[in-house]
């Protein structure tokens, strides 16, 4: 389903843990990493597509996460010309995305990249919040920057509410 401007409706998913780190997934058989994302099917809402993609790509269900935020607007990126499939009709020149920020409520062990017969990812790790902006492929970088900027206050508030380990008072020797 491509819109009149040539953009495919899509959802993007940022999953964070209680420490404010985000899940960074490695594309199957590649050295590139990204957030989970996927197309919205006809008749499907963005939220329904997000839950479907969450299960297909990461193996998590509704009970494993909670929605913390979603982007106010659709965000777009253009594909590099070398990635556009010019022989398809209509031609898709890029993606328009609605992004969701989710908090993982289950254990990390619930994450399973192999639920689909054609997995999108073959690995994942927790990374610092801003890390993906510097590491994603260049044509997605502006969208990632905008998404992370929009979600930053929510994730930082989450970090502020995480109990911190108390360090033992430092031992000081009296002088004199």
Swiss-Prot record:
PROSITE patterns tied to this protein: NUDIX, NUDIX_BOX
One Pfam family from the record: NUDIX
GO molecular function per UniProt: mRNA 5'-diphosphatase activity
Nudix hydrolase domain boundaries: 6-149
InterPro entries, per the entry: Nudix_hydrolase (IPR020476), NUDIX_hydrolase-like_dom_sf (IPR015797), NUDIX_hydrolase_CS (IPR020084), NUDIX_hydrolase_dom (IPR000086), RppH (IPR022927)
Source organism of the structure: Salmonella arizonae (strain ATCC BAA-731 / CDC346-86 / RSK2980)
Nudix box, short sequence motif: residues: 38-59
Protein name: RNA pyrophosphohydrolase
């Amino acid at each position: 389903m491509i819109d009149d401007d040539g953009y495919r409706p899509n959802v993007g998913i940022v999953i964070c843990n209680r420490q404010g780190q985000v899940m960074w997934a490695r594309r199957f058989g590649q050295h590139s990493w990204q957030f989970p994302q996927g197309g919205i099917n006809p008749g499907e809402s963005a939220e329904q597509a997000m839950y479907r993609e969450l299960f297909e790509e990461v193996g998590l269900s509704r009970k494993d996460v909670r929605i913390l935020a979603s982007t106010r607007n659709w965000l777009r990126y253009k594909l590099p010309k070398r990635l556009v499939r010019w022989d398809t009709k209509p031609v898709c020149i890029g993606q328009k995305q609605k992004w969701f920020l989710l908090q993982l409520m289950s254990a990390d062990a619930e994450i399973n990249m192999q639920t689909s017969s054609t997995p999108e990812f073959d690995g994942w790790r927790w990374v610092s919040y801003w890390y993906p902006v510097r590491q994603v492929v260049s044509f997605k970088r502006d969208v990632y920057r905008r998404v992370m900027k929009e979600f930053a206050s929510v994730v930082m508030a989450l970090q502020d509410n995480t109990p911190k380990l108390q360090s033992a008072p430092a031992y000081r020797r009296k002088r004199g």
